[in-house]
C-alpha cells in the first residue's frame, strides 16, 4: 500500500498553525495520474474525508474510486484519518506534512489549496478563518497585534512514506 504525504512549503509572517478549516468536509483538489498506464488527465479532482464510495468487486470503501479511461483499471484514493497536521511557523519555509493519502493505482502530482483554511496569530492567538489560498498567497491585518499577517510563496509536493499508522 503506497501512502503519499502531502507536504506544503510557504512563508508565514505573523501567523502559525495553518490548516484546513474543517478536515471532515475539506475538498482536497488534486491532479491524479494512473500508475498502471501513466495517464495523467489535466483536470482537477477532489476527495472529501466524509464522502465514501464502494469499491467495485470488493468489500472496501474509498474516498475516490475511478476507472482509468485509458487502461480501464479501477483505482482508489483514501484520506488517512487522524493524520492531519498544521503548517507551523517554527519550520517556516520548510517542507511540512499536512495530510496522508492511501493511493492504490493513483498518484497525485499536483495540489490546489482552493478550499477554506484557518490559522492563528503568533502574537495574540487571534484566529483567522476563511483564508482563501486559491492564489497561493494571502494577506490580512491582525487588529490586536497591529501588524500585517501573510502567507506567501506556497508550493506543494507529494512524498512516499511508510504506513503512517504503524509505530
Swiss-Prot record:
InterPro entries: CXXC_Zn-binding_euk. Pfam families: CXXC_Zn-b_euk. GO terms for molecular function: zinc ion binding. Zn(2+) binds at residues 34, 37, 68, 71. Keywords: Metal-binding, Zinc. It comes from the Eukaryota. The keyword Metal-binding applies. Requires a bound zinc ion for normal folding and solubility. Belongs to the UPF0587 family. PANTHER family: CXXC MOTIF CONTAINING ZINC BINDING PROTEIN (PTHR12857:SF0). This is UPF0587 protein F46B6.12. It comes from Caenorhabditis elegans.
